[in-house]
Amino acid sequence: GREFGVIEGKEIAVDYHCDPTDSRFPGDKSFSKSPDKNGDLVYAHRPQILWDSITNTIINIAYCEGSSRAPSALYKFCEQNLFKIIDPEVISEIYADSEYTGEKQLIYLVIRSDTNVTMCLKQNPKIKRWREETIKKGQWQEYGEQYRIASQDVVLAETGKAFRFIVKQNTETAETRCFGSTHVDYSPRRILDSYRIRWPVETGIKDLVENYFLNNPPGTSPEKVETHYYCVMLARLTIDYFLSVLRESKWQSPQEWSCILSTIRTAIFSNQNCELTINDSGDLQLTYLDGDHLGIKNNLAKLLEKRK
């Protein structure tokens, strides 16, 4: 991905995906339990995913056995799938999902990457204690129309590094979410605003599930699942590279991200009257009988002609 210019590796999101679709195999020793979106323990595949938040493309994906959120699992995943690909000096920020809440995980990411880490925090006993301390101080400020935020700085054990802890509360329901960042030089508002950069990994995982069949590995053994994930990653990178060389402005989002596979498939293949022939050069020739109102197919033809 880096060689073809579709990955920068500067701002990286780390996420975890629980695929309970194979929970019908509770007796299979290749599976272990994991909480799904509802918090219920199910037998599942649990890939961990690295995403480039700036270019909106996958960096790596790996099958995880055992406790996927344990410090040892995160260490193994990052050492084998992140730092062998991206030099820590290149990374400017890591955004972590709440599934990785834990002081050891945070300390590992901070020390190993030598960069700033921002994350949503699951409310375990320590986070709840910090939350109550922050709320008691009562130093709230408005954040949008429905929320208010408060913060305090804490010191991480072992490193002595300052960590800005933020409570975001819904003013109508009093529901709270917690966030944290090593960016103690940022205001709480700026930290929350910058955390949105992590969102592409959420839509990216949905794209992998819907268009690349991430949740449908051809088997239950770790080897087959790992191979499936590798093929999914290559397929997504191939499409991202294709979009980068085609440079079709009509397929760019307002954030200048390229469209997803389903958009390409619809524009090129859906509801099209076509004729397939062999031209004078002996090549297969696909002719769109309904024309090319958007000019996309003409641009694609020019690209393919150059690459013959």
PLM features per residue range, with description:
Residues 112-203, 208-209, 299-308:
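An anionic, glycine-rich sequence signature occurring as long contiguous blocks
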Residues 1-51:
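Active-site-proximal, Lys/Arg-enriched surface segment
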Residues 65-129:
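Domain-level cores of phosphate- or acyl-group-handling catalytic modules
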Residues 187-195, 210-227, 246-251:
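Short, solvent-exposed helix-loop connector elements
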Residues 36-87, 176-177:
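Electropositive, glycine- and tryptophan-enriched low-complexity nucleic-acid-binding patches
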Residues 22-31, 104-108, 129-133:
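Short acidic, glycine/serine/threonine-rich loops at helix termini
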Residues 8-22, 56, 91-101, 117, ...:
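Short, conserved catalytic/metal-binding motifs centered on acidic residues
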Residues 138-156, 235-308:
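A short, flexible helix-boundary coil/loop motif
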